[in-house]
């Protein structure tokens, strides 16, 4: 018997580290691309329900000064929840809305249609939905100026796992629709208290223009590279398969041939 030449096996040994090094470099590149999308101060502006409900804050003064500008086209009506199906809360001016937020109590759905209420069965959750609506509506009206030029409703949710993984790829506008349905008493994929916590996190994500950790980890601009973190993982998996195939080939090449 004579052994087969080992040059091909040696070439395989040299190739695998080079492939792994290439994948490592690509991982660094895509990781840097994601980090390059991190938010800076003033990029987006939001306020939480406490700020919207306090007349002496920047948000409260903005609400009192511009309520008619934003909601005048709808007859000054501010509605949270849903008229069909489910329940809603209707406010007809900023004074009544200001009396309602910030809301308190255990989060839950509405259990009746309400007009200018000061409290509701939905507890703190109704206040979160109201604050998110204010953030979205005032952003759309150009009354929450920012340095990015982005509308809050167009930002994309990302980085969630487990029971919240269905949120990945959803815009803030789409999440608000989910929040409205939950408030009205409709069944959704999130449920309480998670949807209440998420609403609170979005409202506080860019508090007065200052991005927090939730904004950095879970909100990206539309089309952002940060919303595509799986590519390095896929590359590693592909190289793993290739390496295994080459290893099997190397073992075959190293076997002695019968004379």
Question: What positions do the PLM features span?
Answer:
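Bacterial N-terminal signal peptides that target proteins for export
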Residues: 3-20, 231
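A short, hydrophobic C-terminal helix/tail in secreted or cell-surface proteins
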Residues: 229-247
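Bacterial N-terminal signal peptides
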Residues: 18-29
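Coiled-coil-like amphipathic alpha-helices with heptad-repeat character
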Residues: 3, 13, 30, 243-246
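C-terminal membrane-anchoring or membrane-association module
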Residues: 244-259
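Soluble extracellular-acting proteins and domains
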Residues: 37-226
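Sec/Tat signal peptide C-region and signal peptidase I cleavage site
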Residues: 32-36
């Amino acid at each position: 018997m004579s052994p087969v030449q080992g040059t091909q096996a040696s070439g395989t040994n040299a190739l695998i580290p080079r492939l792994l090094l290439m994948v490592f470099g690509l991982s660094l590149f895509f990781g840097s691309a994601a980090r390059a999308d991190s938010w800076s101060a003033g990029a987006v502006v939001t306020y939480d329900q406490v700020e919207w409900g306090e007349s002496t804050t920047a948000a409260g003064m903005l609400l009192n000064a511009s309520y008619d500008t934003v909601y005048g086209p709808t007859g000054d009506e501010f509605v949270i929840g849903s008229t069909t199906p489910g329940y809603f809360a209707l406010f007809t001016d900023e004074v009544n809305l200001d009396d309602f937020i910030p809301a308190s109590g255990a989060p839950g759905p509405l259990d009746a249609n309400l007009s200018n209420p000061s409290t509701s069965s939905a507890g703190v959750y109704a206040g979160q939905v109201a604050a998110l609506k204010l953030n979205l509506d005032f952003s759309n009206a150009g009354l929450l100026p920012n340095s990015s030029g982005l509308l809050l409703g167009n930002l994309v949710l990302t980085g969630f796992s487990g029971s919240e993984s269905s949120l990945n790829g959803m815009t803030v506008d789409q999440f608000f629709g989910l929040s409205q349905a939950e408030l009205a008493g409709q069944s959704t994929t999130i449920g309480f208290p998670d949807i209440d916590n998420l609403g609170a996190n979005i409202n506080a994500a860019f508090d007065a223009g200052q991005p927090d950790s939730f904004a950095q980890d879970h909100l990206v601009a539309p089309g952002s590279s940060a919303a595509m973190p799986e590519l390095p993982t896929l590359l590693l998996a592909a190289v793993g398969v290739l390496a295994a195939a080459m290893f099997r080939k190397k073992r075959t090449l190293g076997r002695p041939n019968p004379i």
